[in-house]
Amino acid sequence: METLLENAVRGIPTGCVFALLAVGLVLTYKTSGVFNLAFGAQAYASAAVFYVVRKDHEWPLLWAALLAVVVVGPAIGLLLERVLFRYLRTAGSMAKLVTSLGLLIAIPEVVKLVLGDESRKNPPPLWYVMRTDEWLWPRNTSIVLDAGQIATIAATVTVVVALVLLFRFSSLGLRMRAVVESPRMAELNGVDSERVSMTSWMLSSLLAGLAGVLLAPLFASLNPLDLFTLLVAALAATVFGGLTSIPLTFAGGLLLGVLQAVLAGSLPTDSILATGLRPALPFLVLFLLLLFRPGLRSTREVTDPLATVEAPPPAPVALVRPHWMTVGTRAFGAVVVALGLAACWFLLDGYWLGLVISGIILGIIMMSLIVVVGMGGMLSLCQAALAAIGAFGTAQLVAATGMSVLGAIVIGAVIAAGVGALLAVPVVRLDGVYLALATLAFALMFESIFVPLSWVSGGAVPLSVPRPLIGPIDLADDRWFLLFAVLCAAAVSAVVIRLREGTTGRFLQALQTSDVAAASIGISGRRSRVVAFTVAAAIAGFGGGLMATYVGQANYQSSFPYLIGLVWVALLVSAGARSVQAAVLSGLFFFLFPAILTRLFTFPGNWVESNPDAPSWVASALGAIQPNWAQSVAFILFGIGAITYAKHPEGSIEAQTATSVGAIVRWVERRRGDAGTGPSDPVPPPSPEVTDAPPLAGTGRPTADSGSTG
């Protein structure tokens, strides 16, 4: 019993870590209506500033803390509110979530550009160093609470008490909640919604800064990925509190930390449960809470009763353009692909050819996002994990059974489809934020539990996958593999287009408009979404098997980490989540754009070296440009692209395509009109009797028969 109690007490500091992050998320959601996935990125920004001024410039502790937490943290929140989120108050949950996803990608890269990209080892603590033997509790046990743990506990309790008092007993807390529910109605009651919104974001960002500075010493080096993974682990406490209750969130964080510590003390250190289950416990608890917490699945976001109805995104251009243009576009696309293939075959060296092949394969994986996100309206954040399942299935089948690689790729896709179907059955009951969190929890569970297992990934040494022979053609030659990848992409795109234009695609389009209306005409929303999720998983698994075959091994860390999967989602939704063209171009862009930027950023330094007589100020300015900026600049642009989703939910490529198609159709119709043939699809003008009719009472719409008489 004493051992159990000691383990439970040891879990309190860890629970407070979870609780501090979870309370910060709840505060942001409660005061702005945004489930801020970028909370960890904001925490990283403040922690990086604290590191630089405290350790590099040796500022006093107090001034460094004030700058990082009290100045930089709220300043980031104010900037985000003024530039972005003030325009998203009445937007849907998908737009807010995608915007925060873009910020999650962009903010750490901006910090690296501003403060430098060097490794930051041993982040300095926010507290003064104390002797750890002064913090024994109780004195006659082996429990040790050091200064950092005491500071974390004290900060978490203080924050929770202060926020509870703020929301229960202050007018500011009441105004914050009122502005989230309806900015317009709050303004009618004399509330300055602009000022309240700014205050809310500054307060939540201050808490993010405090969490970042306080928790950074838990890691050997300052890394945004560590803070984000810790944030996702804390999401279980957030869901335990229903995304609104701060006391329940605090209790959930404590319970999670205690449970993890009890498991650590009870399980054998060398057992599979200890090495796999304990690190994955927060993600497993999050997944189970999302599925089974009472009332959570029926929770819907609060909508502003005075807000206008949010229009659905326009129909895909491929479904509404004239038939002659569809035929012409596909013929023109085939010519462009043939010319591009010939140019790659004869002009590119091995490096650039490899990037093109990788981009095409990634385009296939991104086509899975077209099915689940574009057509299904479900923000899935686990497609990288499903692609990894296809890659591991391919590698294991080849290694264990000697099966042909092509057959193993197909069966690997079937395995991924089976996993996707099993995941979809419970997950599709969720929607919006909850579905995105459930798929993210699955991705992290897969990474923590299954990837380390030798029968899944091969263990520490990745499984190799040889390139196959197809008759006399050896795919070990990159040029032949390029042709093979293009043919595979064409086949998958045909499947996606057929699905989009078929019955399932029409059902999914109806479900995006209204579940109730779709159900009234006999459409099963659950069955249609399970089908979409399963097909998307199969496509992702097929792409993962192709990627493993091209790379030569099924390597999770280099090809399929969950954070890279989030970048894929951000990149595709910014380009167009319903367009096959956007998927292929996004895959190519992901690999080619950073490489092109690297070449561009290398040129100034090379020029300075080859021109030693250049003016010193020119040499200094050009020499400051570093080639390693390329990755940061590329990811910043990827994140900014996701932020534009709120303005163009159809995607930038789809929006530009719609503009071009409209211009071409108008030009053709004008030409036909000048030739005396009239427009190709004449639309009769509205009847004046209907247009001039008096409106229906209370609707503003004319009646068809009033005005036609008399």
List each language-model region with its residue ranges.
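Short, strongly hydrophobic alpha-helical membrane anchors
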Residues: 1-6, 134-140
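Short, hydrophobic transmembrane alpha-helix segments
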Residues: 1-6, 26-35, 51-64, 342-354, ...
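Residue-level signal for short hydrophobic patches within transmembrane helices
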Residues: 1-12, 16, 199
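Transmembrane alpha-helices and adjacent helix-loop boundaries
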Residues: 17, 21, 40-45, 90-123, ...
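Hydrophobic positions within alpha-helical transmembrane segments of bacterial inner-membrane proteins
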Residues: 19, 23, 27, 66, ...
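Transmembrane alpha-helix boundary signature
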Residues: 80-86, 110-121, 169, 215-216
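Short amphipathic alpha-helical coupling elements at transmembrane boundaries
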Residues: 85-90, 175-188, 509-510, 520, ...
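Transmembrane helix boundary and interhelical loop/hinge segments in multi-pass membrane proteins
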Residues: 166-174, 178-182, 499-505, 511
